[in-house]
Amino acid sequence: MNPVFTPNVAQKILFIDRDGTLIEEPVTDKQVDNLAKLVFEPQVIPALLRLQKAGFRLVMVSNQDGLGTPSFPQEDFDAPHNMMMQILSSQGVKFEDVLICPHFNDENCSCRKPKLGLVKDFLTQGFIDFTQSAVIGDRHTDVELGNAMGIISFQYQRGSLGWNAIADALLNKGRSATVVRTTKETDIRVTVDLDNASKGTINTGIGFFDHMLDQIATHGNFKMEVNVDGDLEIDDHHSVEDTALAIGDALRQALGDKRGIARFGFSLPMDEAKGECLLDLSGRPFIKFAAQFEREKVGEMATEMVPHFFRSFADGLRCTLHVAAEGDNDHHKVEALFKVLGRALRQAVKVEGDVLPSSKGVL
C-alpha cells in the first residue's frame, strides 16, 4: 500500500512520464545518463506549480530500459535524476511518488507501461478520482496507460500540446455535472452548469414545482436542466424527493473538491413573506427547517413536500442548511424559501481564489 495516499479517498492525481515530458529525451540513445543531458521541457515547472495549486497531486511513471544493467548502470541514472528532483523540489514542485519500470520490452514484465503494474495500488486502493485525474506523456504508450486506467490522457508535444496548454485544459474544465437517478417510481435526469447563467429547461410534471426549481437556478445564477418522469398518478412524493436528491448530488459533483469557493451563503430578502437561508457546503448533511403552511397544496404541489425537498436536497449536496419562512400567504412563503436557497447557493459556489476553505484540508 502506498503510505502517501489514504485508501478509499479519491484524489486528483496526475501520472506523469519523465523522459520527453518533464525533461528532454536524448535523440541518440534515449538515455539521460549524465548531468549534461539534463534539460527541462519548456514551461514545465510553472505549469506543475499551477496544477499543484489547484489541488492535483503528482506521481512520476517512467519506463527506463535496462536500468541497473551494464547497458544503463544505476549510478548513471541516479546523478541526473537526483538533480532533476532537487531542482523541482527547490521550486516547490512535489512528486508524491516515483514509479519506475527497469525492464526491457522483451522481458514481458507486468510493470512496463502501458501495463498496469506500476499503478496497481492506485487502482485497487481507491486513491484515484477517475473524473479529474489524468496521464501525461509524450508516447502513445502513455495514452494507452490512461485508457487502461480509465482516466483521460494528454500526449505531450512541445510544439502543439505543451505544458501551458495541458495545464489550461485541466484547470479550465467547467463546473458541470449530470446525474441520472432511476428507481421503480421515478426516472430523473439533472444537469447543472455552475459557470453558465443561461436558462435551462425544467419539466417535472408538477407546474408549481417547475416554477420553484426555476427560482433556484435563476437566483443561483447557474444553468439547470431537469427532466422527471414520476408516478404522479399516485402523488408527488417520489418525484419531489428524488428530484431534490438528484439536484443536490449534481451540484456536489459539479463543485468537485470545492477549492476556491466561498463555501458559505446567507440570504434574507424581505417582501410580503420573509425567507431566510444559511448554507454551508460542509460535506455533512444537516437540515433545520422552520416554516408552517395552512394550505394542503400550492398549485399541484403538496406543501408537506416542501420541507421534504429541502431535507433531500441537503442529503444530496451534503450541506448544512438552515431555512425558515414567515408570512401570510403560503404561495409566497414557499417561493421565498426556494429564492433564498438560490441566492445562498450563488454566494457559496462563487470562486474567490484557489484555496480550499477548510482547516481540515477537505470538504
UniProtKB/Swiss-Prot annotation:
Signal peptide: none annotated. One of its GO terms (molecular function) is imidazoleglycerol-phosphate dehydratase activity. Pathway: Amino-acid biosynthesis; L-histidine biosynthesis; L-histidine from 5-phospho-alpha-D-ribose 1-diphosphate: step 6/9; Amino-acid biosynthesis; L-histidine biosynthesis; L-histidine from 5-phospho-alpha-D-ribose 1-diphosphate: step 8/9. It is found in: Cytoplasm. The keyword RNA-binding does not apply. GO terms for biological process: L-histidine biosynthetic process. Its EC number is 3.1.3.15, 4.2.1.19. Residues 1-174 are annotated as: Histidinol-phosphatase. Its main location: cytoplasm. HAMAP family: Bifunc_HisB (MF_01022), HisB (MF_00076). This is Histidine biosynthesis bifunctional protein HisB.
